[in-house]
Amino acid sequence: MFSSIARAIIGTSNDRALKAYRRRIAEINGHEAALATLDDAALQGKTSEFRDRLAAGESLDRLLPEAFAVCREAAKRVLGMRHFDVQLIGGMVLHDGKIAEMKTGEGKTLVATLPVYLNALSGKGVHVVTVNDYLAKRDAGWMGQLYNFLGLSVGVIVPGLEDDARRDAYAADITYGTNNEFGFDYLRDNMKYALADMVQRDFNYAIVDEVDSILIDEARTPLIISGPSDEPTELYNQVDGIVKQLVEDPDTYDKDEKFKTVNLTELGSERVEQMLSEAGLLTEGNLYDVFNVSLVHHTNQSLRAHTLFTRDVDYIVKDGQVIIIDEFTGRMMEGRRYSDGLHQALEAKEHVTVERENQTLASITFQNYFRLYPKLSGMTGTAMTEADEFDEIYKLAVVEIPTNVPVARKDGDDEVYRSADEKYEAVAALIEECRQRQQPVLVGTTSIEKSEIISNLLNSRKIPHAVLNARFHEQEAAIVAEAGAPGAVTIATNMAGRGTDIKLGGNLEMRLKTELERLPESARPAREAEIRAEIEAAHDIVHAAGGLFVIGTERHESRRVDNQLRGRSGRQGDPGASRFFLSLEDDLMRIFGSDRMGPMLEKLGLKDGEAIIHPWINKALEKAQKKVEARNFDTRKNLLKYDDVMNNQRKEVYAQRREFMRAESVADVIGEMRADTIAQMVERRIPEKAYAEQWESAELAEDVKRVFGLELPVVDWAAEEGIDESHLRERISEAVEAHMAAKAANFGPDFMRFLEKSILLQTLDHLWKEHLLALDHLRQGIGLRAYGQRDPLNEYKAEAFALFTAMLEDLKEQVSSVLAHVELGSDPATAPAPAFDPASMFTSHPASGPYDGVALAEPQPTLAPEMAVSTYRAESVDPNRPETWASTPRNAACPCGSGKKYKYCHGRVT
């Protein structure tokens, strides 16, 4: 009560922000009259003037009023559009590094031109991030006319571009592209071997369109670059046949729909063990013995595929492939795959070809990618419901921009029915009623399956309609363009991120484009006049009928997605209406609704075939949605804490990598690595203050031979009177440095510099890839530490740091060893530089958590073909004598027989 009184007196924080922005509008408008008198050349000259003023020390904030006014004047001349005052506010919000919430149809694309123009004046580049390639190309071409008029260059990043074209696009003042393309280019750049090969420049400023979709809905899933693995795929089909039989009995597993988890019961474990044994897959021990970990993994993923994932809801099968469906947009996510073997389990379930798993080479989440920009802003029609998350994770404030014309849409209360069939009948009846008065209808569904239920129902009633879901992705633009025509009925699987407005009467631009290009030039003017008249007449009919009627057939988990659907109606002051039809069988009502909802509705008078309309229901549903949103926020926040550990290590590795590439020579770094490696060897075999008889001098000689390929009289040196560990270290160092100096003299200084740098970079890449896998495995099991009363996050941080430290120690030893062993089989001048090979890699954005591991293979660092490395393996390791295991190379299998690498087992850093 008191908070509402306070808001009424002093206003909300949003009101106060708008008040401050409105004060600047008068200043911007004050330039309009003078700029209107300038000819085109004088107006275009303003860009050079602004750049000179920036170079002289003036700030972008000081330039803002005049720069915005220049951009508006240019838009009037080039695009025939003038920014409204509320659009100026939106532009200022974006320039200030905030999120502008603007309703559908309020001209977000035009709003973005203001801060884009202003920030591009610095020459440091502006990235405009869209949700799909169509919008990136459309907006770059459309708004590019304005930027080119003002003397700014525009680039666009789309799939399939060669590196030279990408580099040119990033070098432009303004670059349009999708979130995926920007992120993948960042990862690819950090896998290259020369700065000149990179395509991106330093980050400056990004504006993210549909910011809620990219930074919230897709925040949990990482971008991954991977290479092919040698793992066989037959086991997926074998396990699938067993699990398919198992799940016929619901007592064999426990499923939690709320948290989307499934586990075998005790009965299920016994049954699956028996079936695996009968199939010859489980040959010794029980299912949960350490050497059967692969079987457990395959069984769990197959169980998830059969019980948690539904065809035509979570994925579709098209052209022999399992294609994921985005739960927020209903789009096919072609090219994306679930990670950690889940996609292979789905392929086995659907009897299509099981593709090999891929091994992760590099990955990053959108949360961490977009936090790399010094300045970030975004725009969307629905952000206020997630304002807390934007603020806490991205430090982005949300400002709700008022509409230019008040919203005239009428939002009806939800209608609740007992069963889904009753609900669909009511939806069909309302559609028929709307068609009789020629009112267009947009029906929103949450899955392909449900859109086809409604489509079949309308077909039985002979009601013509269009279906917009992942199956008909190609016809999307044409379907949306006609969705506002008189009497049109369109069924859509979620309208989030569709990017195309539904205009009352039909889309004039789309019709002109599609119809006129088929006609000869002479016939076009007459047909254009006819189309314009038809669209105008249709607009009047639809306007009189009440505008677009949006029908929601189910509440989504997120209020934001419901608001996006509603927002398709009532754009720019048009009339419209919306209503949601629900049933007690809907997922949200069934899983998250209160157990008391059913009995309460009966008390309110809910009967078969009738609907209940009551404000209490709306409040109860909103409460359920808030509960789900809070849970999802906590999940994302928790995942970010874990990902931040990897992110800090990633930033360190990538920064170090760039330092190596930037350096003329890395000889000093390599020299320090050799010195550290020798010091570690000596320290391990001759601990400080140890007696001479405790020295492991023979083992030290073995280490030197294994790492550096040198047979030194270490045992004899150690037997000398008065020698200590520092003298031993110096003698070994002198011998190793003499060996390396002779090698450098043989190779020549130029080639030695090239060799040192390429081996250093390739070894770092190889170890980083291994480290990513180790972190994945660590993350998967770390939650169990909670049972031991230990904080999993703190445990993860400590162990991840130990793994990172071990990786850096491995780097020193491996680089030193490879350089010591490398020999040339031909003239050094002909040896090629290490190559970055994108053709052998895959980009993916899997629809699962960023820590779902992928089984990685174990390739060695790739050297140039003419370099032959002679390796040495210590022969003194005896699996039956643990005291000899210390000579085991850190990346070799542990002699204990666990199957793990030595460095993760008995050689683990503690």
UniProtKB/Swiss-Prot annotation:
- Enumerate the Pfam families for this protein: P-loop_SecA, SEC-C, SecA_DEAD, SecA_PP_bind, SecA_SW
Chief site of localization: membrane
Reaction catalyzed: ATP + H2O + cellular proteinSide 1 = ADP + phosphate + cellular proteinSide 2
User: Which cofactor(s) does the record list?
Assistant: Zn(2+)
Q: Where does ATP bind?
A: Q87, G105, E106, G107, K108, T109, D501
Q: Where in the cell is it found?
A: Cell inner membrane; Cytoplasm
Q: Which SMART domains match?
A: SecA_DEAD, SecA_PP_bind
Q: How does it assemble?
A: Monomer and homodimer. Part of the essential Sec protein translocation apparatus which comprises SecA, SecYEG and auxiliary proteins SecDF-YajC and YidC.
Protein name, UniProt field = Protein translocase subunit SecA
Q: Which organism is it from?
A: Acidiphilium cryptum (strain JF-5)
User: What are the leading ranks of the lineage?
Assistant: Bacteria, Pseudomonadati, Pseudomonadota, Alphaproteobacteria, Acetobacterales
